[in-house]
């Protein structure tokens, strides 16, 4: 395992350095763990490619992604910043991406209780988001194992973290 026995902060630093060195990966956006933006601003705005949840060890990526969606929805981050192309999650073993548009409609639900704590995995809201992101990740995720799929991960980032790109180039392993 490439990132064995390290703390979450160190994991974020190493993933940023190893895979996103060509981008700005040092921004801290409210409670979002990890963000990747184009290194230059455009008309004073940053263009984000990724907002991600980072978890150490072998944390459940479905729970982590559900937590990220709840974090973004609770803070209404998408109202202050242009949303990224992708939402993602990584732990010490792998990284996974989903297109932001796949979950965008969750944020506009009228009857959704956004006051829940994103890390409380026992709420009806968490369960709803968890089931949704699990379904998306199982059928339409782009996931890569650190160490094993490094070449494919670098290719995915190079081909898809491009300003103005509206579709995803799938990378076959």
Language-model regions: role of each:
Residues 32, 37-57, 67-69, 73-173:
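Charged, often flexible domain-edge or linker segments that flank or initiate folded functional domains
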